From Swiss-Prot:
The modification Hydroxyproline is found at residues 64, 67. Disulfide bonds: none annotated. The gene is CLE8. This is CLAVATA3/ESR (CLE)-related protein 8. The keyword Chloroplast does not apply.
Length: 86
């Protein structure tokens, strides 16, 4: 009986955690993408809005900055432990 109670409590806590963490996201399909509401017909460079048209979405992708570690990998050295042996 104690085992069933413990398992049910663990299941409830896990479900609660999963539900609350998924609700924290606005839209799980927009990872790395930001959307701004822009009136349709707007020149995005001059920000001239025409209010009689419906709103559109302008999507801006966030580009990661900084050094790419894959470009700075040195070739394996024969004396190292990870060197492939024949």
């Amino acid at each position: 009986m104690k085992v069933l109670k413990r398992d049910s409590m663990l299941l409830l806590i896990t479900l609660y955690f999963l539900l609350t963490t998924s609700m924290a996201r606005q839209d799980p399909f927009l990872v790395g993408v930001e959307k701004d509401v822009v009136p349709a017909g707007t020149d995005l460079k001059q920000n001239k809005a025409k209010p009689h048209l419906p709103n559109l979405f302008r999507t801006m992708r966030r580009v990661p900055t900084g050094p790419n570690p894959l470009h700075h990998i040195s070739p394996p050295q024969p004396g190292s432990l990870n060197y492939a042996r024949n």
